[in-house]
C-alpha cells in the first residue's frame, strides 16, 4: 500500500497555505509532518482524510481496498479529543464505532489496552486531560483502518501514556499499517520527516 501526493495545493480562507507539495508513505512506515505553526501540517492531514478539498494536485492510495474511498480507509485523530462530556467512556467509544462503521473490534479490550477499562461507566466530563486523550486513542483500536492520521497525538499524555501509544503505533506498523502524524514532538517510534514551510 502506498499513499502519495503530487503537487498538492492547499488554500484556506482565500490564503494559500502551501503549494507544490509532494509526499509518499508506504505500508509499515510512519511519517512525521513538521513545520512552523500555520505551515499546514493539520491541513495536510485533513486533505488526506477528505475533510478538505485540494485546490490543486492529487492525493492517491495505491494498493488499498479498491471498494473503499481513501477517507474510508483513514482514521483521523485531531488535536482535540471530540468526546461528548455527558456520555460515559463506553458510550463515547460506542458512538465513534457506530459513526465510523466497518470492521468493529472489542471495545472493552480497546479500553483495557489504553488503561481505561476501570472507568467505562464514568462520564467523559470527569476524565483528566490525559484520560480523555487515551479514550480518543481507543478509537484507533475499536475500528480497524490501515491509515492513521494523527494531529499532535501525544498531547496531554504522561510518559507512561506516551510509551503505551508508542507500542500501539509499532504494532499498527507491524501489521502493515501506515501513519502520518503532525507533531512538534518526537513520535517515539522510527519515522521519516516531511517538512512543510521551511525551517520549523
Curated annotation (Swiss-Prot):
It catalyses: heme b(in) + ATP + H2O = heme b(out) + ADP + phosphate + H(+). GO terms for cellular component: plasma membrane. It is found in: Cell inner membrane. Keywords: ATP-binding, Cell inner membrane, Cell membrane, Cytochrome c-type biogenesis, Membrane, Nucleotide-binding, Translocase, Transport. GO terms for molecular function: ABC-type heme transporter activity; ATP binding; ATP hydrolysis activity. Its EC number is 7.6.2.5. GO terms for biological process: cytochrome complex assembly. Belongs to the ABC transporter superfamily. CcmA exporter (TC 3.A.1.107) family. The complex is composed of two ATP-binding proteins (CcmA) and two transmembrane proteins (CcmB). Part of the ABC transporter complex CcmAB involved in the biogenesis of c-type cytochromes; once thought to export heme, this seems not to be the case, but its exact role is uncertain. Responsible for energy coupling to the transport system. This is Cytochrome c biogenesis ATP-binding export protein CcmA. It comes from Bradyrhizobium diazoefficiens (strain JCM 10833 / BCRC 13528 / IAM 13628 / NBRC 14792 / USDA 110).
